[in-house]
Amino acid sequence: MTEAASPARVWIALAILAVAGSFFFALGSAPLFDVDEGAFSEATLEMFQRGDFLSTYLNGEPRYDKPILIYWLQAASVAAFGINEFAFRFPSALCATLWVVLTFLFARRYFPVERALVAAAVMATSLGVYVIGRVATADALLNVLIAASMFAVWLHLETGRPGWLMAAFAAIGLGFLAKGPVAVLIPLAVTFAFCLLRRDLKTWARAVFDPLGLLLFAVVALPWYALILHREGWAFVQGFFLKHNVGRFGGTLQGHAGSLVYYVPVVLIGSLPFTTLLIRVLTRVREVWHDDLQCYLLLWFAFVFVFFSLSGTKLPHYVLYGMTGMFILMAVYASGLRSRLWALLPVLLFFVFLLALPQLVEVSLPRVPDAYYREALSNAGRYFTWGYFAFAGAGAAVTLWFMRDRRIELARKLVVTGILATLGISAFVMPVAAGIQQEPIREAARIARSRNLDVIMWRLNAPSFSVYYGRPTPSREPRPGDIVITKARRLAELPGYGHELIYSKNGIVLVRVTG
């Protein structure tokens, strides 16, 4: 019994380390990243400043991008931990942890416990989940609620128990309160496709139109929408439903366009270091298709992949809404992986890329068209510390050793490289990105705050400035006497005015406009 239990204990330890390292290690060390982290965090702070916890504002203007649930969670975290990066990110880390735990619990019902633990560890240390579990946005919250609804719906379809259906409606209602219609669309469409394939649309219709379930959804989701519609009226409908939902699918929002194959590299990179496992599942589609549960999980991934590939607006994290089922399938088929070289090659290339990154940045500088990014990247060298190179080199060395070793289980090797990668990215790679992009914003804000300067933002979208500044920062055309935060390249565009430099770093300037 001890010998049989030993592998499970190892996987338990790896899964716990994977979750702790991916979502909580150095969670508050990096400054908030713009645009999204800055926008969510500042909107949460303005709820406190306005004494209004029903509607969201960003720099004094109504913000209709997302519903209220993530802001409530961030507000609770700020109340508990204070105004800092950890507090803003903690709800995402907590939701990502719950997402992994739910995936493990679901997988354990149908597969050996070791495979369920593999699914949890693979999921927690995959690059895409690692990132989304650490950022102060609504996406980790949405993912756990989509996963909860999809698991509950399957359990209802399998057992017929109404309790699982009620759990699904509750999760969908919370998802609608977290990010809107997408939380309804995914379980609705995937279950329709599955029941259609199984020629059982009657069961689907009974579940979808269950009166008690619809009532539960309405009780969970609709009160806030009713209140905000009463308060904001058509502006909310236009801003949230039409612009940020219909508009995202039908057109390109905020420049986030992409081709039909946009998500192919996104999925391959986002699955690192487990890309080979993903490819293995895709080569076993016929086998997957003939198992009801595996077919359901594959349909979940396929619908999300196709739907967002057809969408006019594309962002990398959208495809994660369908990856939960794929992570379970990757764990199920991991035991059949034999080639150490093939399995570990993607993560080796990742570490080699990190080693070469400083040189790649330097070589590519002349080809960067935007003067702001060119100036910011020109100072990148100072942020690549010896620790960065030691981490990337050690990761490559461990991976090469794993390629030679024949004793350790291949899936275990992949998870260990995933844990090394996530810990190293948090400790050494994120500080590089933060130093280049966000440190100038934070430093400028702290200078303005310490001197009690009245600042406006001009031709710059950096809401994290307001978080560190401690108050909303209006955006408008500058006038003589204004203190302006902007990009250095924009100074030449000041309409006939001069300026006095207060702060300058990496293409960001804080200036006083003179007549």
Label every model-predicted segment.
Residues 2-342, 504-509:
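Membrane-integral, polyisoprenol-dependent glycosyltransferases
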Residues 2-4, 166, 249, 281-515:
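Membrane-embedded architecture of ER/inner-membrane glycosylation machinery
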